Design a protein with these regions (language model features):
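A well-structured
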Residues: 1-308, 595-597
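Post-HExxH zinc-binding segment in Zn-dependent metallohydrolases
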Residues: 409-437, 447-449, 453, 527
Length: 597
């Protein structure tokens, strides 16, 4: 790992995404932006007239959304690779403003549709010529009690940029303005600490390096704690306001009901994970023993327990491994992955000013998905490649097999395809290294960590979100102190039976960007539970299971998300898949103990 982040221009072109596939340059984007704004003004002429020709109004509504998508995506992606680039940030700000203008100009549309007679709406939804829009109309009718009169909808739309402010402030603070102290390396040198490099340091064999990085991150966030608490409070208060304005009982209801996910799924997840905390404690106790520690601290949780085996993988070797591990998905699937590798889909390496983390952006029907990585040469980041490409392939199949109004799959299933890729690749590696005790132990450790960080950790995050929003809904203040206390107590619940829960872990909630997209992190946990089952089916049943899985990938939002998963044979309306996945965690732990004995 380089001690200092490279500048973007120092990274070879084959490891950067190519946004010219969207627009050849910023001038073309400017022209497209002008066209979208003109189309928005034209669409505004429908105000008060939707009832005259509702079918045509629906078509033009979706056409405008499709026209705007590349304008927004180009600006967003352009800004992600250098948050310090004022030109790119200017484009992103203008795209955001465009979104608010369009939302305002189009805000009358759904209320006017909903003012139509129910029988007419049902007739339009049943019209074969309007089949592309039937899912939209079904959801619209279902959301009728939560749609406001046109003038009120317009006011909410005008709040768009204000509502986005907490997330934007958080991003600017953490990606641009915030800097971390250097990490002291064992040889006496120092290395630059960023959110992008933290994952490497926290896995270090050197406990001093781990503690230096952990304290550097947590204490720096803590020094901005009051600011971040105020920022997060703004985000939560907006969630509560939006929910109440739309006549939902809670902010959680407002997030989950439109997705057709019962809140019992959320509650089942927390309940089942709580029941499995003793197994987590068993795993943590084994970690403590294998690491030979008198005390297991929070900065000891990520380093591999198998110290005499190292799987260091360059990006190119990692991608080869992903292709090999995902062969069960079929040759057409692999062909698209190869295209992604060389076709300008992926931005690979960390660089100065680049956003941390990883994501896939799959909204561009006429181009291809884009993937942002911050690749370090380790096994974890190899799985990240498989994970993000799982998102991309889900988008690709949905976009290919569904019309635009039905192609945007639900948040609830958004993590299933990505995590299924990880699980399938893991099974391949466990089989490949079955006779290599060191490698097998290392991989089992990684699999256990995937469960700990994806099921237990994300469920803890989900529980924190529920606590924070419930506090706000009950009129309790969200301050640095109250939020940090709640987060610390959750860490004690999940880890305290075995771990020394360091005081500054109370600051960790401050660095989680997903909290600004409320009630989302739980889908990582439910997604893994579904994905483990899907991967088992694909590997055991072969082609028939792959066909069923492809139906799920291709479903988009044509059917409700629970039903989409049922196409692949998984029923997430019951706690059974969660319980079964946690059973896999227990079995994997037993296997790991046997290997390490």
């Amino acid at each position: 790992m380089a001690a200092k982040l490279r500048k973007r221009e120092e990274i070879p072109a084959q490891y950067k995404w190519d946004l010219s596939h969207i627009y050849p340059d910023d001038a073309a984007w400017e022209a497209a932006l002008a066209d979208v704004l003109a189309s928005g003004k034209k669409f505004a002429a429908w105000e008060g007239k939707v009832a005259e020709n509702p079918r045509q109004a629906i078509r033009e509504y979706f056409d405008l959304n499709q026209q705007a998508e590349p304008v927004f995506s180009y600006a967003f992606l352009r800004g992600e690779t250098d948050n310090g680039d004022s030109v790119a940030q200017g484009l992103r700000a203008r795209a955001s403003q465009m979104g608010v203008q369009l939302s305002t100009a189009m805000s009358f549309f759904e209320p006017e549709l909903l003012s139509l007679d129910d029988a007419l709406l049902a007739e339009i939804a049943a019209d074969p010529a309007m089949a592309d829009y039937d899912a939209f109309l079904r959801n619209l009718i279902r959301q009728k009690p939560h749609t406001l009169p046109a003038e009120q909808e317009k006011l909410l739309a005008m709040m768009g940029q204000v509502a986005q402010a907490p997330n934007h402030i958080f991003g600017m603070l953490t990606d641009v303005d915030m800097s971390f102290p250097p990490v002291q390396m064992p040889d006496g040198t120092t290395a630059e600490l960023t959110e992008g490099t933290y994952s490497q340091f926290i896995r270090s064999d050197s406990r001093d390096v781990r503690k230096s990085a952990f304290d550097g991150i947590m204490n720096t966030y803590g020094s901005f704690g009051s600011t971040i608490a105020a920022t997060y409070n703004g985000s939560v208060q907006n969630d509560v306001f939006q929910a109440r304005a739309r006549h939902y009982a809670t902010a959680r209801d407002a997030r989950m009901e439109p997705l057709e996910i019962p809140t019992s799924v959320y509650d089942n997840l927390i309940s089942e994970v709580h029941a499995a905390i003793p197994v987590l404690n068993e795993y943590l106790a084994l970690r403590k023993a294998l690491m030979g520690l008198d005390e297991l601290h929070m900065y000891d949780l990520y380093t591999p327990m198998v110290k005499d085996f190292h799987m260091e993988l360059s990006y190119d070797k990692a991608f080869d491994l992903v292709l090999e591990g995902l062969k069960p998905m079929g040759e057409d699937y692999l062909a698209k992955l190869r295209e992604a590798r060389v076709g300008g889909w992926i931005d690979v390496y960390p660089s100065k000013g680049k956003s941390s983390g990883a994501f896939s952006s799959g909204n561009l029907r006429d181009v291809h998905p884009y993937v942002l990585l911050n690749h370090n040469d380790n096994l974890s980041d190899t799985f990240t490649i498989a994970h993000e490409l799982g998102h991309s392939m889900h988008s690709f199949y949905s976009n290919t097999n569904q019309p635009a109004p039905k192609s945007d799959y639900s948040l609830f299933v958004a993590e299933v395809a990505s995590t299924c890729n990880e699980a399938t690749m893991m099974r391949h590696l466990l089989k490949t290294f079955a006779d290599d005790k060191k490698a097998l132990a290392y991989l089992l450790n990684h699999f256990l960590e995937q469960f700990r960080t994806t099921v237990f950790r994300q469920t803890m995050f989900a529980e924190f979100e529920l606590i924070a929003h419930t506090m706000a809904e009950q009129g309790q203040p969200l301050t640095r102190e109250s939020l940090s206390k709640a987060y610390y107590e959750l860490n004690q619940k999940y880890y305290g039976a075995v771990c020394t829960v360091d005081e500054n872990i109370a600051n960790e909630w401050m660095r989680i960007p997903h909290f600004y997209r409320s009630y989302y992190v739980y889908v990582y946990a439910t997604g893994l539970c579904a994905a483990v089952s899907l991967s088992d089916k694909i590997l055991s049943e072969g082609e028939s299971a792959v066909r069923d899985y492809r139906k799920f990938l291709s479903a988009g939002c044509a059917v409700p998300p629970i039903d989409a998963l049922k196409l692949a044979g998984i029923d997430m309306s019951s706690p059974e898949p969660i319980r079964r996945a946690l059973g896999v965690f227990k079995d994997t732990l037993a296997q790991f103990k046997a290997v390490m004995a």
